[in-house]
């Protein structure tokens, strides 16, 4: 858990998380060597957010805005990250990754996780302008605009061999795989989800 937060701090330039004499690196690379549990029981048996979230550690997306957009390679190596939780209805670029530009995300599963933001919200990535492959997300995603089970928005990016199981809700541009795409490619992706669009 600590290493994952440290990596997010490294990419985002957050000295409060990434302590020591470290320079921000938005092109940093990482490869998981084990599964990671951040929180336990984020979602109940019905897939809804747990009743008591007071003890949860909040997640900050890797590449959490345009200035910190991620361009490295993140290889999950077949492992899972469990229990990511973020709940702020005024935040953009929300997901495991917030904003990817030229980066590569592969071979990782995100389970028992909840993301709620304002715009560009996705289980894997809020705004994908890179390459995502062989990943999955089991959880709940919600927001106002550009909301997707895997990616909230995807322009000039690609998504392949990925799947989503869970619930996604948004007011507009909402989809099970991706909320909005432009000059992007989606191949061999599927979902099993409830979709609620046109709601707050």
Q: Where do the protein language model's features map onto the residues?
A:
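Surface-exposed repetitive/solenoidal architectures
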Residues: 1-200
């Amino acid at each position: 858990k600590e290493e994952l937060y440290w990596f997010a701090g490294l990419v985002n330039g957050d000295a409060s998380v990434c302590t020591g004499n470290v320079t921000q690196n938005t092109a940093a690379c990482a490869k998981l060597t084990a599964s990671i549990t951040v929180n336990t029981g984020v979602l109940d048996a019905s897939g809804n957010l747990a009743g008591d979230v007071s003890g949860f550690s909040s997640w900050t997306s890797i590449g959490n805005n345009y200035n910190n957009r991620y361009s490295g390679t993140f290889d999950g190596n077949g492992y899972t990250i469990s229990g990511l939780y973020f709940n702020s209805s005024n935040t953009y670029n929300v997901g495991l990754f917030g904003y990817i530009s030229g980066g590569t995300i592969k071979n990782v599963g995100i389970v028992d996780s909840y993301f709620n933001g304002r715009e560009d919200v996705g289980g894997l990535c809020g705004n994908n302008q890179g390459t995502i492959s062989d990943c999955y997300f089991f959880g709940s995603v919600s927001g106002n605009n550009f909301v997707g089970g895997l990616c909230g928005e995807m322009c000039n990016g690609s998504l392949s061999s990925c799947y989503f199981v869970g619930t996604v809700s948004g007011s507009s541009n909402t989809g099970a795989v991706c909320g909005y795409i432009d000059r992007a490619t989606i191949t061999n992706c599927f979902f099993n989800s409830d979709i609620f669009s046109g709601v707050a």
